[in-house]
């Protein structure tokens, strides 16, 4: 952001994932109180596109893990921020405190390619966030589960036209 300001250019993130109709429906269900008090949100954004250590020789990939070009974060800044925004958007709460475990699973990388983050939201909700670029078998896996005192919701970006709603002591309904 500071570099962009000094350069006179705009630095912005397009949080397009919250534009999906069923993500907006999740937000309205939470705001309406359908889930009651939100107890926990589990969100992940994982993929395995950077699992190959040989990518260190690929200039199209190398910059992502170079602090001089990417800044202070790798995978979290690339994908994890979308997961955090999703949790904030759906819950209507903002991050208040967090504890993060960032790790480079490939020794040649200076920035993280995997992260676990525990977040306390300003409304009291806890968020468990995992983001990884070395999760072989995951394909652009943005998923969110919201657990409240009256029920739970589950949405996956791989199946964006389906939202699972499970009320306490009820059957799961697939909303399409």
Show where each model-derived region lies.
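A generic structural signal for well-ordered alpha-helical segments
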Residues: 2-4, 146
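C-terminal helical cap and adjacent loop that interface with cofactors, partners, or active-site loops
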Residues: 171-176
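Predominantly a Rossmann-like dinucleotide-binding segment in NAD(P)-dependent oxidoreductases
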Residues: 7-12, 17-109, 163
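Contiguous beta-strand/loop segments that form the cofactor/metal-binding neighborhood of enzyme cores
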Residues: 78, 82-169
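Short beta->alpha connector loops at strand-helix junctions that form conserved
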Residues: 1, 15, 135
């Amino acid at each position: 952001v500071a570099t962009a300001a000094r350069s006179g250019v705009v630095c912005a993130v397009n949080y397009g994932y919250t534009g999906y109709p069923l993500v907006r429906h999740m937000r309205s269900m939470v705001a309406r109180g359908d889930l009651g008090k939100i107890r926990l949100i589990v969100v992940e954004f994982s993929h395995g596109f950077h699992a190959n250590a040989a990518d260190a020789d690929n200039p199209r990939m190398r910059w992502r893990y170079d602090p001089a070009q990417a800044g202070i974060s790798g995978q979290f800044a690339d994908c994890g921020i979308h997961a955090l925004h999703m949790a904030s958007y759906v819950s209507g709460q903002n991050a208040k405190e967090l504890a993060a475990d960032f790790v480079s699973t490939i020794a040649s990388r200076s920035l993280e390619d995997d992260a676990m983050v525990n977040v306390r939201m300003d409304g009291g909700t806890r968020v468990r966030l995992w983001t990884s670029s070395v999760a072989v078998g995951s394909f652009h896996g943005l998923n969110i589960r919201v657990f409240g005192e009256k029920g739970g919701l589950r949405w996956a970006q791989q199946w964006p036209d389906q939202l699972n709603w499970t009320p306490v002591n009820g059957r799961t309904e697939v909303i399409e």
